[in-house]
Amino acid sequence: MTPGARMQAVIELLEQIWSGEEPIDRLTDVYFRKRRYAGSGDRRSIHATLYDVLRHRARLDWWIGRTGSSLEAGPRTRIIAELALEIKSSPQETKAIFNGATHCPAPLSDPEAELAEALYGRPLTHPDMPSPVALEYPDWMDRSLKTLWPERLAVEMSALN
């Protein structure tokens, strides 16, 4: 599979995950059973990117909102952000992945290309992020977790993610 085809697979899986109630492992098993052509390296890469996007969701969404983009935080947008922030793909590399070729994601729209440009070179975690975003836990747990681990919150939450 090409890098673009791998990213398209991640986008398709994220769409299924966020639109249903099926467990992720079951969705990925069914997805790959229907796509026997995907080798073990492809599956490993797709799983790694998929779980990275899930683990980084709050930070990706924060960055997407921070750019002032009119784009909604959805599977495509989060992949673009993941490529720029975590994988460190340049805007040109991101455009090469989103090339519209067979089995690849459709070409980037102008707002998506602007997002890739705006996020490239930035760190995934920013000092202005609130704790629930930076450490990837729900807002409603903030007070309880800060009470439980007043000095070790970052260490403990990093261990969970």
Feature names for model-found ranges:
Residues 1-161:
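Class I Rossmann-like S-adenosyl-L-methionine
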